[in-house]
């Protein structure tokens, strides 16, 4: 019972609250002898300092005990150390310790002491935090000596730097606001009282030899009296009124500084001051005083803060020169997708072929043993190539969602930053993280940012940092284990600029082309977006018709189209989204937004109306000759945000087309130049600059027909670009020269002749339909819009002259005449 009482007394003494690790607490507690057979209690006190301090204080007291009892205690203590968070431990609250001691006392004898020792030897569990568990460490002090305080740092050096920075700000603010308060270990500053007196009092004090020190600044004079005189001056009423505003701190000296202003016509009594041995001088204006010093100190504080924020060196107990990311992430912008909105293949439509290519990847990630046991090597990398907006990133997310594995995504531009060597280090960290969480997926978006070819064709100057990053990426991709279960997905829209070493089998084994969707794919994409948004559609909306109107649209374009249609319907306060909303959204995507206030007037309005009618007349004549060609459905002379003053809408064909025949190309050339031809006919040769975009597009089409498509008889089936570059040599060399000046001149002459022939044919078509040109032009000028059946009623009387028929069928008579004339 005596032993239990001693243990209870010791625990009660240990339950005193510990506020801070002061010097008095660092002394070990005195020993307490046990009254029952020499058995003793081991007590551990944990003092957790307030939040913000970076140390944990641990005191342990080890007392002597008999060998047998000591062995039992050590065995039980080891078991307590190995137990989890739910183990019993002695607390610093007095009631719990007293209850435990009382229970031990009832058991009696040595067993009670041993039980108490076992419970008390269990270390307290520190509270967990989001930054990780504090590193509490226990050290056994051999020899049974007196217990010691153990100090363990639980914060990193960077956090300690910020704590010191905050302390510096606090001291700076304290010195600025309360300069009279002394810092620890320094003498308190004397409180200064400034008293303004007349200049006559200053002269009288000089004559009486009462002045100790004078500071002259032009006509402004500050002076202090001698100590015995200053003591008497403290009792004057004007001085007491000046000192009432200053805090009266005990033990803080005060001083009085008198100020006065010297009249400009009176000299300063320097001779009298020299005679009375008065210290005098002028202020040093090279230093800006208190404000300048404060600004300098503030600049230093801000500079230290910036350095601590951006410095990539860790001040922790690890390597002093170890580089790490300033954002506390070794992998740069790499992040694991933890979104609850999981993307699957059901959310991806219009790219069925790409889905099939990626299904095997998904199956491998779900069941890798199925392939590994057969000796099959899974694809180490899959490169997704396609136009912007076709869904490359969405496909990668769908692969991760189907396989239910960690999806680590990053952008290739995040690898290379300011610090040299950071790119390669981040690549290593990224792949190490992926291997640790395998099976997993690494997705590198816009991989061409760091993987451009190193042969000099696609770079202007050398960039060693990017080359190091690329080399590390090549090494990591080629250094996978066969069972690592980590797959790399890369996305780019510039596969031609990638380094050949990256595209070879063994790194990116598969290249999946993600193309723009066809008509059925566009319809599927529209259904997905409509169902996701739960869009209320009108009865006149047929998504197959919308898909037919949007030839060439990508998945991102279609998503934006659905959103624009919903916005237009909401702008009109509609309850449902109608077909007209989708049509307006398509026109906004193609031609821009109609301007409500910028209206054409006068002669410009008439010219633009005839220009658009010229396109419609020539396009209708071409459609009459070529079956299956779409017809003009809408004319408008309302200016749009894209810079177009007029708009001629010709919908795409009802079926997807992948080839363009020579007669269709010639028909498009004539249609593009129909507006310019109408201006020449109506204005008698006084044309405008309104055909700028038409001429640009027609020139591009004619050049490709001559120089790339091989549709010209004089040039023949030759690719002029390949011929001028010296072939398709991968190294960029020129095996047989690039001096092809005569060929370039010939191409230019052929392009010019083709465009001139198309313009002459367009003039013939416009002159053959004067009634439609004038009548429809005047009607469009008045109404600003013509569409639908009303437009078709005007265009049904358009005729196609024989010149158009000859030109579309490839007759070269006019072209040859132009060449002979030149």
UniProtKB/Swiss-Prot annotation:
Zn(2+) binds at residues 611, 615, 694. In the N-terminal section; belongs to the AAA ATPase family. The chain crosses the membrane at residues 154-174, 288-308. It is a multi-pass membrane protein. The lineage of its organism: Eukaryota, Viridiplantae, Streptophyta, Embryophyta, Tracheophyta. It is an enzyme of class 3 (hydrolase). Its EC number is 3.4.24.-. It is found in: Plastid, Chloroplast thylakoid membrane. One of its GO terms (cellular component) is chloroplast thylakoid membrane. This is ATP-dependent zinc metalloprotease FTSH 7, chloroplastic. It comes from the Eukaryota.
């Amino acid at each position: 019972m005596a032993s239990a009482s001693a243990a209870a007394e010791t625990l009660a003494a240990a339950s005193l609250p510990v506020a801070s690790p002061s010097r008095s607490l660092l002394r070990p507690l005195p020993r307490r002898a046990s009254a029952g057979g020499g058995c003793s209690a081991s007590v551990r006190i944990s003092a957790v300092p307030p939040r913000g301090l970076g140390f944990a204080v641990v005191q342990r007291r080890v007392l002597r005990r008999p060998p047998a009892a000591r062995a039992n205690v050590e065995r039980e203590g080891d078991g307590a150390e190995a137990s989890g968070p739910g183990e019993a431990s002695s607390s610093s609250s007095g009631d719990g310790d007293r209850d435990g001691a009382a229970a031990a006392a009832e058991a009696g004898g040595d067993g009670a002491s041993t039980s108490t020792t076992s419970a008390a030897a269990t270390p307290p569990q520190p509270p967990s935090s989001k930054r990780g568990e504090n590193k509490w460490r226990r050290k056994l002090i051999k020899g049974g000596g007196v217990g010691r305080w153990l100090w363990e740092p639980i914060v990193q050096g960077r956090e300690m730097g910020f704590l010191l920075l905050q302390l510096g700000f606090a001291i700076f603010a304290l010195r600025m606001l309360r300069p009279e308060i002394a810092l620890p270990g320094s003498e308190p500053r004397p409180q200064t009282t400034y008293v303004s007196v007349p200049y006559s009092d200053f002269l009288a004090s000089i004559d009486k030899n009462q002045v100790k020190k004078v500071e002259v600044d032009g006509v402004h004079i500050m002076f202090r009296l001698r100590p015995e005189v200053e003591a008497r001056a403290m009792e004057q009423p004007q001085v007491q009124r000046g000192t009432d505003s200053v805090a009266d701190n005990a033990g803080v000296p005060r001083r009085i500084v008198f100020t006065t202003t010297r009249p400009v016509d009176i000299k300063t009594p320097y001779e009298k001051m020299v005679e009375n041995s008065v210290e005098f001088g002028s202020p040093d204006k090279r230093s800006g005083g208190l404000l300048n010093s404060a600004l300098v100190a503030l600049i230093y504080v801000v500079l230290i803060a910036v350095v601590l924020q951006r410095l990539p060196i860790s001040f922790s107990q690890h390597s002093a020169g170890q580089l790490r990311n300033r954002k506390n992430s070794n992998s740069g912008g790499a992040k694991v997708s933890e979104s609850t909105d999981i993307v699957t293949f059901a959310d991806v439509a219009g790219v069925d072929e790409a889905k099939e290519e990626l299904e095997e990847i998904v199956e491998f990630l779900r069941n890798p043993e199925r392939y590994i046991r057969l000796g099959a090597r899974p694809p180490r990398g899959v490169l997704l190539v396609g136009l912007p907006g076709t869904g490359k990133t969405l496909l990668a997310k769908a692969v991760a969602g189907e396989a239910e594995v960690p999806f680590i995504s990053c952008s290739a531009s995040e690898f290379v930053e300011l610090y040299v060597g950071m790119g390669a280090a981040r690549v290593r960290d990224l792949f190490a993280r992926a291997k640790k969480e395998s099976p997993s997926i690494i997705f590198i978006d816009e991989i061409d940012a760091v993987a451009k070819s190193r042969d000099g064709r696609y770079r202007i100057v050398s960039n060693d940092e990017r080359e190091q990053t690329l080399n590390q990426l090549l090494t990591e991709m080629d250094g996978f284990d066969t069972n690592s279960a980590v797959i790399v997905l890369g996305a780019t829209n510039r596969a031609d600029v990638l380094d050949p070493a990256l595209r070879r089998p063994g790194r990116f084994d598969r290249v999946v082309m993600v193309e723009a969707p066809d008509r059925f794919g566009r319809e599927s994409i529209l259904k997905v977006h409509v169902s996701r948004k739960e869009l209320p559609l009108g009865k006149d909306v047929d998504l197959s018709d919308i898909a037919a109107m949007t030839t060439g649209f990508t998945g991102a374009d279609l998503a934006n189209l659905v959103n624009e249609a919903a916005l237009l319907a909401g702008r009109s306060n509609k309850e449902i989204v109608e077909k007209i909303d989708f049509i307006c959204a398509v026109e906004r995507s193609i031609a821009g937004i109609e301007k409500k206030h910028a209206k054409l007037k006068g002669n410009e309005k008439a010219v633009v109306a005839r220009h658009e009618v010229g396109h419609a007349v020539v396009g209708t004549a071409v459609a009459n000759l070529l079956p299956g060609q779409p017809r003009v459905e809408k004319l408008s002379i309302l200016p749009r945000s894209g810079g177009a003053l007029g708009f001629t809408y010709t919908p795409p064909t009802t079926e997807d087309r992948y080839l363009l025949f020579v007669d269709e190309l010639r028909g498009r050339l004539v249609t593009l130049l129909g507006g310019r031809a109408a201006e020449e006919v109506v204005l008698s040769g006084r044309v405008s600059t309104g055909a700028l975009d038409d001429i640009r597009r027609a020139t591009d089409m004619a050049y490709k027909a001559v120089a790339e498509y091989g549709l010209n008889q004089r040039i023949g089936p030759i690719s002029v670009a390949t011929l001028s570059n010296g072939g398709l040599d991968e190294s960029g060399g020129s095996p047989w020269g690039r001096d092809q000046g005569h060929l370039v001149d010939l191409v230019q002459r052929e392009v010019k002749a083709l465009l001139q022939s198309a313009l002459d044919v367009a003039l013939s078509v416009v002159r053959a339909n004067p009634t439609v040109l004038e009548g429809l032009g005047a009607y469009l000028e008045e109404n600003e819009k013509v569409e639908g059946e009303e437009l078709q009623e005007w265009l049904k009387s358009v005729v196609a002259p024989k010149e158009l028929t000859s030109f579309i069928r490839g007759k070269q008579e006019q072209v040859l005449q132009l060449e002979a004339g030149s």
